[in-house]
Amino acid sequence: MHEQFEAIHPFLDGNGRLGRLLITLFLIERGRLPQPLLYLSAYIEAHRQDYYELLQRVRTHGDWMGWLRFFIAGVTEISLEVVGRADRLMDLREKFRTRLRDKPKALALLDELFLNPYMSVAKAERVLKVSNPTARQAVMLLQRKGMLEEITGRTWGKLYLVKPIMDTIDLKGNGK
């Protein structure tokens, strides 16, 4: 399907990104991927020359086997990376939970932070269903324990981030 989409090249811009996204959506639709965790963009970018050569060989020589080998190698490599990241995230979560064992409100915030690593005091109020001072206390505890880092530099409306989560999933927090 990806090769066919690339061959049609229906848009002036964005065909590559959309074609790679279609891979993930197709696998989800077919029940082969329960969550959108497999993105081949990094693999394709790292093997760009092979990618284009193999796409061209499908068009010129009908070399589907070469294309499929490349594609399966990419799925394998990215899948192993995703499993490694998931393992590291579970280890990080357990390490943090151990440090907060006797702090139920902070533990509840921690669970939320592993769904979305950004937190504000207002969000903590909603998540915990507590007053502003109680929410602030839970956020400050996570900050003192080195789990949250304030990223705005503001006095009011501060936003906090769990940078170790972002580092683990290899995303840059705070535009860095």
Where are these regions (language model features)?
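Phosphate/pyrophosphate-binding active-site loops
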Residues: 1-86, 91
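Alpha-helix C-caps/helix-loop-beta hinges
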Residues: 8, 116, 145-146
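Short alpha-helical segments that sit at the start of domains
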Residues: 82-110
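Conserved, hydrophobic alpha-helical core segments of structured domains
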Residues: 101-109, 115, 132, 156
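Short, cationic-aromatic polyanion-contact patches
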Residues: 102-103, 150-174
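Basic amphipathic alpha-helical segments that dock to polyanions
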Residues: 113, 135-145
